[in-house]
Curated annotation (Swiss-Prot):
Gene3D superfamilies, per the entry: 1.10.10.350, HUPs
Cysteine pairs bridged by disulfides in the record: none
Oligomer status and interactors: Monomer.
Positions occupied by motif 'KMSKS' region: 232-236
PROSITE patterns attached to this UniProt entry: AA_TRNA_LIGASE_I
Family: Belongs to the class-I aminoacyl-tRNA synthetase family. Glutamate--tRNA ligase type 1 subfamily.
Reaction catalysis annotation: tRNA(Glu) + L-glutamate + ATP = L-glutamyl-tRNA(Glu) + AMP + diphosphate
Keyword annotations of the record: Aminoacyl-tRNA synthetase, ATP-binding, Cytoplasm, Ligase, Nucleotide-binding, Protein biosynthesis
Protein name per the record: Glutamate--tRNA ligase 2
Source species taxonomy: Bacteria, Pseudomonadati, Campylobacterota, Epsilonproteobacteria, Campylobacterales
Positions contributing to ATP binding: 235
Length: 439
């Protein structure tokens, strides 16, 4: 079984979605069940409704799952596993207070050495502290694993101490809950971000202590770097939020296409998730960081907009008139996102706001003069744009840029765009909607 294990503590990050996509693809390729595990044990950081938001995004991306679990439902199991380790002398109670440990950390900082927990501290405050934590005994050997992307990763004994499994309130730590659940659901491969590399040896040690016979295979994805700063994309970067990208009008299929492409060798530029299942391989992923490129994402989104069938295009743009399909196709040629496309069609059909956009009084006068001329014309009487244009120029007494710029704004709501002769048939059939001014 493979899994994707998000925390409902904020917007879904593109790095998390990338991991979800890859786990889903490999599960499909290997004909294994796919589990979604909501890691909600950190009650203080959980945000109401974020779990549902994550699941909705996965559905939009075309990702389905065979099983959905909430980690908090397994707390009794986590405590049971901790008790097992205590009985087998693989874990121990630690009575050292948070204040004591903080002093030791400060001492290590002042002495410019890494802080490392010492097992001898476990009973120092036993008489004063009646709510101990449970720690796993530190290993006396190195922990290594062969990462499917990063190759061999090794942690020496002095890099690992006796770490906490259960907190004072008996709640499991992230690493303990994660390791227990991966064992419980027989997870065979974990694809996740490289920010989890330091968690992996701890989870391996927990699973070894609990008697895992078949080691889990790990694949840690390189981080995604911001295109301008070159630094890791954090949750503060709006483009790192999948929700933000969707709200900006990026299609789910295009986002998926992009996240599969970056740092990867792909056989074609534009593809769907189902197509990627046919050829995706972890071996083709680079071990170097990937750079986020919003311009290229827009390009891919533009290509996917062109691939939308008529029914889906009308649905996404909220247009009910099928006669406007041809116009939508023309507008797509100039749009990188669905939001841009919806704005273009809205400007075309809505009353034109010449005052708000163009405050120059001379320009306003020319617009009004041309508007009055156009209102007197029978749009259906002209066989083509050329004959329509000549009559409009004659009636308005305008020419050159004094004519063409106001004309484009009055007919499309935009000062530039698709050639007017191409969209003239749609102007003719919808002139009563098109030729309106905002009050």
């Amino acid at each position: 079984m493979l899994r994707f294990a998000p925390s409902p503590t904020g917007d879904m990050h593109i790095g998390n979605l990338r991991a979800a996509i890859f786990n889903y693809i490999v599960a499909k390729q290997q004909h294994k069940p796919f589990l979604i595990r909501i890691e909600d044990t950190d009650k203080e950081r959980n945000i109401e409704g974020k779990d549902r938001e994550i699941l909705e995004i996965l559905k939009l991306m075309g990702i389905s799952w065979d099983k959905l679990v909430y980690q908090s439902h397994n707390i009794d199991y986590h405590r049971e596993m901790a008790e097992k380790l205590l009985k087998e002398n693989k874990a121990f109670y630690c009575y050292a207070s948070a204040e004591f440990l903080e002093r030791e950390k400060e001492k290590a900082k002042n002495e410019k050495r890494p802080f490392r927990y010492l097992d001898e501290w476990a009973t120092l405050e036993k008489d004063k502290n009646h709510a101990p934590v449970v720690r796993l005994k530190a290993p006396n050997h190195a922990v290594s694993f062969n990462d499917a992307i990063k190759k061999e990763v090794k942690f020496e004994p002095d890099e690992l101490d006796s770490f906490v499994l259960l907190r004072q309130d008996k709640s499991p730590t992230y690493n303990f809950a994660c390791a227990c659940d991966d064992l419980l659901y027989e997870i065979s491969l974990i694809i996740r971000g490289e920010d989890h590399v330091s968690n992996t040896p701890k989870q391996i040690l927990i699973q070894q202590a609990l008697g895992l016979n078949d080691p889990i295979v790990y694949a840690h994805l390189p981080i995604i770097l911001d295109e301008t700063s070159g630094k890791k994309m954090s949750k503060r970067d709006e483009a790192s939020s999948v929700k933000w990208l969707l709200n900006q009008g990026f299609l789910p299929v295009a986002i998926g296409n992009y996240l599969i492409t970056i740092g990867n060798k792909v056989p074609k530029e534009v593809f769907s998730l189902d197509e990627a299942i046919e050829w995706f391989s972890l071996e083709n992923l680079s071990s170097s960081p990937a750079h986020f490129n919003l311009k290229y994402l827009k390009h891919l989104n533009h290509e996917h907009l062109k691939l939308l069938d008529d029914e889906k295009l009308l649905e996404l743009t909220l247009i009910k008139d099928k006669n406007l399909l041809g116009l939508l196709r023309l507008f797509i040629e100039e749009c990188g996102t669905l939001l841009e496309l919806k704005e273009k069609i809205s400007l075309f059909l809505e009353p034109k706001d010449i005052v708000k956009t163009y405050e120059n009084e001379d320009f306003k006068e020319r617009c009004l003069a041309l508007f009055n001329a156009l209102k007197s014309m029978d749009f259906q009487a002209y066989k083509d744009f050329e004959s329509f244009k000549k009559e409009a120029m004659r009636l308005s007494q305008l020419k050159g840029k004094d004519f063409f710029k106001p004309l484009r704004i009055l007919l499309t709501g935009n000062s530039h765009g698709v050639e007017l002769p191409l969209i003239f048939p749609y102007i003719q059939s919808h002139h009563q909607e098109v030729l309106r001014l905002k009050a």
